[in-house]
C-alpha cells in the first residue's frame, strides 16, 4: 500500500509577508490517469482500488440523463474520498475549499478527478448523453454530507 502524500498539506512561502502558508486544500484535487490498453478491436481501461486510486472502492454510482442546464453535486463530504470519471460525453466539476475554487473539464474515460474530503463540489455543463461515474471510499452515509455551503465554510474555517 502506498502512502497518500496528498493528505499532508505542503508549506509554501506566503507571497504577502514571507511567512509560511498552507497550500490551498483545493490543490489536493487532481487528475488521475488510468492505464489505457489500445487495440484495433477497441480500447480497455481499468481502475484498481488502492493501486490507481489512494483508497479502497466501496461504492460505485453514476449520473446520467442529466437535463440540459442542470447542476449536480452541491455538497461536500466530511470523510469520503471520491473519483469522478466522464464515461461518456463531458461535464465540468467546480471544486471549492471555502477559500479557493478551481474548475476541471472532464471528457475522457481514461482519466478522472480525485476529490478528497472537505471539498465542496458542483457539477455542471453536462453534454447531451454524458455519463459521470463516481468511485467512493465509503458506503452511503447521510451524516458524512455538508449540504449547506455556509455550514461547510464554517467547518472548513473559511
Segment roles from a protein language model:
Residues 108-113, 118-125:
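Well-ordered alpha/beta subsegment
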Residues 2-111, 128-129, 134-135, 140-158:
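Non-catalytic, conserved peripheral segments adjacent to functional cores
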Amino acid at each position: 500500500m502506498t502512502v497518500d502524500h496528498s493528505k499532508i498539506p505542503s508549506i509554501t512561502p506566503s507571497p504577502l509577508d514571507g511567512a509560511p502558508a498552507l497550500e490551498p486544500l483545493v490543490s489536493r484535487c487532481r487528475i488521475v490517469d488510468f492505464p489505457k490498453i489500445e487495440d484495433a478491436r477497441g480500447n480497455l481501461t481499468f481502475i484498481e482500488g488502492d493501486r490507481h486510486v489512494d483508497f479502497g472502492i466501496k461504492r460505485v454510482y453514476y449520473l446520467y440523463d442529466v437535463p440540459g442546464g442542470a447542476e449536480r453535486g452541491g455538497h461536500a463530504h466530511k470523510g469520503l474520498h471520491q473519483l469522478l470519471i466522464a464515461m461518456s460525453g463531458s461535464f465540468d466539476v467546480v471544486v471549492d475549499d471555502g477559500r479557493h475554487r478551481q474548475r476541471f473539464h472532464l471528457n475522457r474515460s481514461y482519466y478522472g478527478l480525485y476529490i478528497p474530503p472537505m471539498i465542496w463540489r458542483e457539477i455542471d455543463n453536462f453534454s447531451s448523453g454524458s455519463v459521470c461515474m463516481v468511485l467512493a471510499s465509503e458506503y452511503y452515509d447521510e451524516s458524512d454530507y455538508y449540504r449547506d455551503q455556509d455550514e461547510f465554510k464554517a467547518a472548513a474555517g473559511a
